[in-house]
Regions:
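A structural boundary/capping signal
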Residues: 1-126
C-alpha cells in the first residue's frame, strides 16, 4: 500500500500502539532475554514493532512495504523498529517517538532488516 493517505494511516497506528502498550522488557515479562511476540498490554521494542506491522498488514499494507529493523542506540543497546514505505517516502515507526521519523533523523546505527521474510544487512540506510 502506498495510497494517497498511507502516511496518515502509519502515523495513526504508530500513535495507537505507542499509547496502548506499556514498555516492559522480555526479562521482566517472560524471564528470558529475548522473546519476540506482538504486544498485549506490555511489550518491549520488537513487540511494539511486530504489533505495528500486524496492524498495517490488517489495514491492507503489502509485506514488501514493511520491514523490521534491528539497530543500536547511541548507548550501544540493541533496538528494533518498523520501517514503512508510505506515500510520503520511507519512515520509521519507533516506540520512542510519537511520530513517524525519517531514518536519517534517528541517532541509530542500522544493522539489519527483515523484509518479506528475508534478513538483509543495512549499509547506508539512513
Amino acid at each position: 500500500m502506498t495510497t494517497l493517505n498511507s502516511y496518515s494511516i502509519a502515523e495513526r497506528i504508530n500513535s495507537d500502539v505507542n499509547a496502548r502498550v506499556t514498555y516492559k522488557s522480555d526479562l521482566e515479562q517472560f524471564d528470558t532475554p529475548e522473546f519476540w511476540t506482538m504486544a498485549g498490554k506490555f511489550g518491549d521494542c520488537e513487540d511494539y514493532a511486530l504489533s505495528k506491522r500486524n496492524a498495517l498488514l490488517n489495514a491492507g499494507w503489502s509485506k514488501d512495504k514493511l520491514g523490521l529493523c534491528v539497530c543500536y542506540t547511541q548507548s550501544g543497546e540493541g533496538h528494533c523498529v518498523l520501517w514503512v514505505e508510505t506515500d510520503k517516502g520511507s519512515f520509521i515507526l519507533d516506540n520512542n517517538y510519537a511520530f513517524p521519523m525519517k531514518p536519517s533523523e534517528l541517532p541509530y546505527r542500522w544493522e539489519s532488516m527483515l523484509c518479506d521474510g528475508v534478513w538483509q544487512q543495512l549499509h547506508g540506510f539512513a
